[in-house]
Amino acid sequence: MGIQFETDYNMETLTAMAKGLRKTVRKKRSRRVHIFAAVVLILGLLTILATTAGGEPPGASGVVTLLALLVLILATVFEDRLNAWFARKRLLPGTEHAAATFEEDGYVSATGVTESRFSYAQIVAVAETARYFVFALSSHHTQAYDKRTIRGGSVEDFRAFIAEKTGKLVENIQ
């Protein structure tokens, strides 16, 4: 009997998972996307300023540009929640709750529909938020474990255990 977790995959959990991916395995891509968004934002603002410099109100194209910039800002600010929303839409029925048990040779995650066994070698990165441990299995797949439900050990014990088993540093993300 190893360390156990029970996790509900709700919007908060899915948002933490999206953030975990963005801050670990997608870090470089995320940085590029944010730089691209900033450049587009600056160019859009310069375009609006150039068209309104003569004292004329912005036309239809200026309003459309402004709305596009607003959508860009909102998508960038709320990207983790947006990704969580899409993930929730793709969540299979019966997988909203998972129970996981961590042993020496691997771990088992059970949902209402299936039970899956994983080896620690499958974990690409480990992140920790205030409430969750997030495992990145690829650039598109994660698992989250709610620290409030831990049994069979402490959070500190699990942090040391998973770092040893994966050979990966547990990244603290806020």
Task: List the predicted regions and their residue ranges.
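N-terminal membrane-targeting/pre-transmembrane regions
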Residues: M1-A50
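Generic beta-strand structural signal
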Residues: T101-F102, E128, L137
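Conserved beta-hairpin
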Residues: A75-R117
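Residue-level recognition of conserved beta-strand positions in structured domain cores
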Residues: M17, T111, A136-S138
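Hydrophobic alpha-helical transmembrane segments
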Residues: G55-L70
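Short, surface-exposed beta-strand-loop junctions and turns on beta-sheet-rich folds
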Residues: E115-R117, V124-V126, H140-Q143, R151
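A membrane-cytosol interface segment of integral membrane proteins
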Residues: Y132-Q174
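Phosphoinositide-dependent membrane-docking surfaces
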Residues: Y107, S116-F133
